């Protein structure tokens, strides 16, 4: 999700939003394919995000939709990458974004992956409905790394432009709570929204390391 898109939620027109965002950096957003897997099966990976306050969110990942994106997310989780990171950008009625190691929205894992979405030539029909997980990127389509966002509300203008790869199955109330927290002028929560521990259950399936750009 870019700053330009989020600005549309705060300004009277796209022109106003673009004028404001031209002075800002875009945030990071991205991607892989396992054949023969039925969509939405119990064998799909399940991610558990435990917040610092004890709240729990669970999400199902869809490797048959965005295989390299899922491989990347699982790889980072298994390395403990997300433990202690925050949701640094929160927009009520839109989405919550996290996964930046610096907590600024400008950091990443030190590499990029290919964007698995239709505008980048990759078939991905998963819509950005409430609870869907998707990868953040910069302007370049192949610039996703570790930052991801969870949809607070359905946002069809993102469909085909970002690599959606999973969906919240438990704890949407936690997403709502984070989305409704007070933020500053840059959409940063005033009270840090910390992911204490992020784990993944792969049900015995070994997922490969992601292909990097």
What role is predicted for each listed range?
Residues 2, 13-17, 113:
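Exposed, low-complexity/repetitive linear segments and helix-based recognition motifs
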């Amino acid at each position: 999700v870019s700053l330009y898109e989020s600005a549309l939620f705060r300004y009277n027109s796209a022109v106003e939003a673009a004028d404001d965002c031209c002075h800002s950096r875009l945030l990071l957003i991205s991607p892989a394919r396992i054949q023969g897997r039925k969509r939405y099966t119990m064998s799909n990976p399940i991610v558990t995000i435990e917040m610092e306050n004890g709240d729990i969110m669970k999400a199902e990942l869809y490797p048959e939709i965005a295989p390299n994106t899922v491989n990347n997310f699982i790889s980072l989780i298994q390395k403990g990458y997300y433990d202690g990171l925050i949701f640094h950008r929160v927009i009520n009625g839109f989405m919550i974004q996290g996964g930046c190691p610096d907590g600024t929205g400008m950091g990443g894992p030190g590499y990029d992956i290919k964007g698995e979405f239709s505008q980048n030539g990759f078939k991905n029909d998963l819509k950005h409905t409430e609870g869907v997980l998707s990868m953040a990127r910069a302007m370049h389509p192949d610039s996703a790394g570790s930052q991801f966002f969870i949809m607070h509300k359905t946002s069809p203008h993102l469909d085909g432009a970002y690599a959606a790869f999973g969906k919240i199955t438990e704890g949407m109330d936690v997403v709502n709570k984070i989305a409704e927290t007070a933020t500053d002028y840059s959409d940063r929560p005033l009270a840090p929204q910390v992911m204490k521990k992020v784990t993944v259950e792969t049900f015995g399936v070994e997922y490969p390391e992601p292909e990097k750009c």
